[in-house]
A protein has these predicted regions:
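Metal-dependent polysaccharide deacetylase catalytic core of the NodB/CE4 family, i.e.
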Residues: 101-104, 108-189, 223, 229-246, ...
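Bacterial N-terminal signal peptides that target proteins for export
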Residues: 1-11
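C-terminal domain-boundary segment and adjacent tail
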Residues: 109, 203, 215, 255-324
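Residue-level marker for buried hydrophobic side chains located in beta-strands
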Residues: 66-68, 141, 307
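Active-site-adjacent pocket scaffolds in enzyme catalytic domains
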Residues: 29-59, 168-172, 176-271
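Active-site beta->alpha N-cap acidic-glycine motif
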Residues: 33-137, 147, 259, 299
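Bacterial N-terminal signal peptides
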Residues: 9-20
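Boundary at the C-terminal end of the N-terminal hydrophobic targeting segment
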Residues: 21-25
């Protein structure tokens, strides 16, 4: 009877000995409030806003540029989270099956080009929808990750691999190299701007340092990359996103959102700069919401000297300010 007791005790000793030993003398991770200002500046100045790239006027002497964009995520959010629920997949299927055709019909009705930021996995899952987007009114397909992964959770090498893989997938599917990127979840790592430059992209649309187009700085140095800034106020997710199992359960009337977006447009028009909307087919494509978007388009078109354009065309025009 004593032998099992002895063996159990021996096993416990071995296991305890294998555990890491922590002492009060070990150096603890430095806390943010202990950082000196040099380190703080180094961190915050990795990626900053440079000069304003708003031209004196947009093409055709337009006063304001309007960029409608749609992040066509489809099933990738659920796939990224390894939530393989048919219920969640059906929401992504709705985006492809119903919403994208509705959006394309609206854009065609009002003769408006738009930009679609699409994860590469969405491109592979829904080739017919991608083909329809490309064939209609020169709409743009921009990068939006491989499977809607968060860049800040990846190593630099893993982020590089997925960005290159996404770039080649979009290029192969559309016959055209993508000109720009909107990072999934607007998530920017310490390596993202470096990798954008490696790919030869001309613009990003993920950051929030201005309302106007601006040049990105990397460690204080101009990069030549145009930023077309985004803002949660001008995104449909905060108003229409819904999570069954969390506190994200907004219930906002579409026309209340219309008032917010119309007010934002009016100020952009007054300032003579840029108006960027970020939308998602799985949210904006529902009946009452696509009707609201149509009302917004009609409202914008009552104004003179408005240039509706893709992100690529806006970035190319703004980039002239850098090159001149």
């Amino acid at each position: 009877m004593k032998k099992p007791i002895f063996m159990n005790a021996l096993i416990m000793i071995v296991l305890v000995a294998a555990l890491p030993v922590f002492s009060q003398t070990q150096k603890q991770e430095e806390k943010p409030w202990d950082w000196d200002i040099k380190k703080v500046k180094t961190l915050v100045e990795q990626v900053r806003a440079g000069r304003d790239l708003t031209p004196q006027s947009w093409p055709g002497r337009a006063k304001v540029a309007v960029a409608l964009s749609f992040d066509f995520d489809a099933e990738t959010n659920a796939l990224r989270d390894m939530d393989i629920s048919p219920g969640l997949f059906s929401q992504g299927e709705y985006a492809a099956r119903i919403s994208v055709p509705r959006i394309l019909a609206l854009l065609e009705k009002y003769r408006i080009p738009a930009s679609f930021f699409v994860p590469a996995v969405t491109v592979l899952l829904h080739p017919e929808e991608i083909k329809a987007i490309v064939e209609k009114r020169n709409h743009e397909i921009g990068m939006h990750g491989w499977i809607h992964e968060r860049n800040s959770l990846l190593s630099e090498e893993e982020e590089r691999r997925l960005m290159r893989k996404s770039y080649e997938t979009l290029k192969g599917a559309t016959g055209k190299a993508p000109a720009g990127i909107r990072t999934p979840s607007w998530d920017f790592s310490r390596s993202t701007l470096k990798l954008i430059r490696e790919l030869g992209l001309i613009y990003d649309s993920s950051l929030m340092a201005d309302d106007r187009p601006y040049e990105l700085l990397e460690d204080g140095k101009p990069t030549g990359i145009v930023e077309l800034p985004v803002e949660w106020l001008l995104d449909d997710y905060p108003y229409f996103g819904f999570s069954r199992y969390s506190s994200v359960r907004p219930h906002i009337k579409p026309m209340d959102v219309f008032e917010i977006w119309a007010s934002e447009f009016e100020k952009a028009y007054e300032e003579g700069t840029l108006f960027v909307l970020t939308m998602h087919p799985k949210y904006i494509g529902h009946r009452s919401r696509i009707a609201m978007l149509e009302e917004l388009v009609k409202h914008i078109q009552t104004h003179k000297d408005v240039w509706f354009a893709t992100h690529e065309d806006i970035a190319l025009y703004a980039k002239k300010s850098i090159e001149d």
